[in-house]
Amino acid sequence: MSPQELKARIASGLLSFPVTHFNADFSLNLPSYQKHVAWLSGYDAAALFAAGGTGELFSLTPQEIGEVTRAAKEAAGSVPIISGCGYGTELAKDIARRAEQAGADGLLLLPHYLMEVPQEGIYQHVKAVCDSTGLGVIVYNRSNSVANADTVARLADACPNLVGFKDGTGQTGLVRRITAKLGNRLSYIGGMPTHELFAQGFNGLGLSTYSSAVFNFVPELALRFYKALKAGDEATMAQILDSFFFPFADIRDREKGYAVSIIKAGVELIGHTPGPVRAPLTNLTPQEKDMLKALIANAGS
């Protein structure tokens, strides 16, 4: 898939990122992962992110990222697979190479590791990764790597394979500056935790689409909300927010890191075998899983 084909594809519909499946000893469980990816691919997702943030990129080795990406690509049929990528520049370039060899259709470049850096540093880092690969790249603004509109424009000028921008900051003013300055040069993705909670507010900022974590275990509900957003169906969105997303967020917010853990728990509760999260994340308690189970049952009623 060419970078421009990827740009068009990610703007065409809802996106999601399968959780990475582990065995009880925390080793990769690729057969279980592929079963889940194949199931998700039967729904109407524009693309899936392998080894993204919800896929616990931060707990995977570069070799494992390549293995997960290859497994996803084998299982996904015609659905494009975008590999997570991140950390320091040289490590990110290595991950990008492995992802390309594994058959990825694109890269999602998560923040560099830990350090606070100036805009020039962000520019040099993203450019180096883009220059190292022929894949289309989506840059992810969040945490300690927040490019401003001028930096994103410089990168778009310098990197013909930079095709997407994903926001995880929630800074509406910054997002609008970027979408206004870059226009149709990029596709724009909403990437806040449980983005459905923010989707209506971000809808007028020029975003093309967003990524849905709950698509992992309630894909029909996730798609119903997405279609209501695109249709301007405020009543349907309000009903889904009130009956599912608000109580879901209440469970998610009980502990730090549950934005990932609760998704893996949801996948388990519908009959898949994703296994535990890797440390330093922690799993939901039995009581919290019961709360989520009841919420899922209600969502299907």
From Swiss-Prot:
Lyase among keywords:
yes
- Give the molecular function GO annotations: 4-hydroxy-tetrahydrodipicolinate synthase activity; 5-dehydro-4-deoxyglucarate dehydratase activity
| Pathway(s) | Carbohydrate acid metabolism; D-glucarate degradation; 2,5-dioxopentanoate from D-glucarate: step 2/2
What UniProt keywords apply to this chain's record, in alphabetical order?
A: Lyase
The record's EC number reads: 4.2.1.41
Per the UniProt entry, what are the Gene Ontology biological process annotations, in alphabetical order? D-glucarate catabolic process
Q: What class of enzyme is it?
A: lyase
SMART domains named in the record:
DHDPS
Cited Pfam families: DHDPS (PF00701)
SUPFAM superfamilies given for it?
Aldolase
**Superkingdom of origin:** Bacteria
Q: Which reaction does it catalyse?
A: 5-dehydro-4-deoxy-D-glucarate + H(+) = 2,5-dioxopentanoate + CO2 + H2O
Name the family the entry cites.
Answer: Belongs to the DapA family.
The protein's name in its UniProt record: Probable 5-dehydro-4-deoxyglucarate dehydratase
* Organism field: Bordetella petrii (strain ATCC BAA-461 / DSM 12804 / CCUG 43448)
